[in-house]
């Protein structure tokens, strides 16, 4: 059996991996090796490894590498520690392929570790662009370290090929997270309210905002200005915590302070978990922030999205997304909630959807001879 080592560091990643993990675990030709790290093991971010275990997956190794600090060096230190710890894990597991997704700093550490140990890498969600985040450089770096690529759109497939990757090893699979959404057992409003001990108002937004790591000095002022604009609207908001990138803790501090001043109108939660997150997204009138979930997943629910700033700049999105800068936030929220725009969103399909996404990935993991030997492909 071909041993596939899946390494995941955060909840959003796990949502992408989930349908793939299920099929690897039941395959007669693949053996699942599961390694969790970083935010999954952090109290601050909800100890989400427990959800993975609850879902029935055996975790082979836990890599406790997150150095939580406001210092700009915390992510590089966390990545370095991940490499040290993962080196021993990969020696122990001896995987045939390391399967990674996306563009997190801990994913870069995992890719660097596997590459230096001559272990082939399969990468999901390469070729995408997010100009306002250092993730953009991380993602392209992982692409060059990987041997086989599963992209979410044809445009991203072409970009990976443009980066010198052999077309026969670049497969457009669609976004696997959408499978997770379509198979979610959605939770009722009543149960959600009981779970979070907060009454959901008739018109509310789901807000997720992460640091713009390419310009970290602006994060504090940005979140203060954003919250000031939101206060001037009439909507209620459920705020989810920012991630562990530099500046995330400062964003979370201001979110908590803001919510504490009007707890009937606003609610803050560190980690909703996948089922609750998607269930609340389904109920919400509007998605606000700068998370990829607004670009990729929200279209499954035909929801209007107000995408703030440059963090997702360059990423392909549907017509349900309104891009705005902070001064135009209120105007964009009003447009997103207008009857014409809401009705337009209801007619749209998700450009990232492929009903066979996880099957495509599994088929190629089984049938492709994945080697670390690569030649640059010239256009």
Name these PLM-found stretches.
Residues 7-8, 14-25, 65-167:
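Active-site and donor-binding regions of nucleotide-sugar-utilizing enzymes
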Residues 52, 187-283:
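Donor-nucleotide binding loops and adjacent catalytic segments primarily
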Residues 299-344:
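Nucleotide-sugar donor-binding patch of glycosyltransferase catalytic domains
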Residues 63, 151, 171-173, 268-270, ...:
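Short acidic-hydrophobic, aromatic-tinged amphipathic segments that line or gate anion-handling sites
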Residues 100-101, 108, 149, 273-317:
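A donor-sugar binding/catalytic signature common to diverse glycosyltransferases
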Residues 31-75, 85:
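Conserved nucleotide-sugar phosphate-binding/catalytic loop shared by glycosyltransferases and other
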Residues 338-379:
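C-terminal amphipathic helix plus adjacent low-complexity
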Residues 7, 41-43, 145-221, 373:
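A nucleotide-sugar donor-handling region in carbohydrate enzymes
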């Amino acid at each position: 059996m071909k041993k596939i080592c899946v390494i995941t560091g955060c909840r959003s990643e796990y949502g992408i991996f989930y349908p793939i993990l299920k099929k690897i675990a039941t395959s007669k030709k693949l053996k699942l090796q599961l390694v969790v790290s970083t935010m999954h093991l952090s109290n601050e971010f909800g100890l989400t490894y427990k959800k993975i275990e609850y879902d029935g997956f055996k975790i082979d190794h836990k890599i406790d590498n997150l150095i939580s600090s406001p210092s700009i060096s915390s992510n590089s230190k966390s990545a370095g520690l991940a490499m040290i710890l993962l080196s021993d894990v990969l020696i122990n597991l001896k995987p045939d392929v390391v399967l990674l997704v996306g563009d997190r700093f801990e994913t870069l550490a995992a890719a660097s570790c596997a590459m230096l140990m001559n272990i082939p890498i399969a990468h999901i969600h390469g070729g995408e662009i997010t100009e306002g985040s250092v993730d953009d450089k991380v993602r392209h770096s992982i692409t060059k370290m990987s041997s086989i690529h599963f992209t979410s759109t044809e445009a991203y497939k072409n970009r990976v090929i443009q980066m010198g990757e052999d077309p026969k090893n670049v497969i457009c699979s669609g976004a696997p997270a959408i499978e997770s959404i379509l198979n979610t057992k959605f939770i009722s409003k009543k149960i959600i309210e009981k779970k979070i001990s907060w009454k959901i108002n008739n018109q509310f937004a789901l807000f997720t905002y992460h640091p713009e790591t390419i310009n970290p000095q602006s994060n504090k002022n940005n979140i203060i200005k954003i919250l000031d604009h939101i206060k001037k609207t009439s909507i209620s908001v459920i705020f989810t915590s920012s991630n562990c990138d530099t500046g995330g803790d400062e964003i979370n501090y201001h979110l908590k302070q803001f919510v504490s001043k009007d707890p009937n109108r606003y609610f803050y939660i560190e980690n909703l978990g996948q089922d609750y997150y998607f269930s609340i997204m389904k109920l919400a009138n509007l998605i606000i922030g700068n998370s990829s979930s607004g670009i990729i997943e929200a279209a499954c629910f035909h929801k209007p999205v107000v995408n703030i700033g440059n963090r997702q700049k360059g990423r392909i999105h549907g017509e349900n997304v309104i891009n705005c800068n902070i001064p135009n936030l209120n105007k964009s929220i009003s447009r997103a909630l207008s009857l014409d725009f809401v009705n337009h969103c209801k007619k749209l399909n998700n450009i990232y959807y492929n009903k066979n996404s996880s099957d495509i990935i599994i088929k190629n993991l089984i049938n492709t001879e994945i080697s670390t030997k690569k030649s640059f492909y010239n256009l």
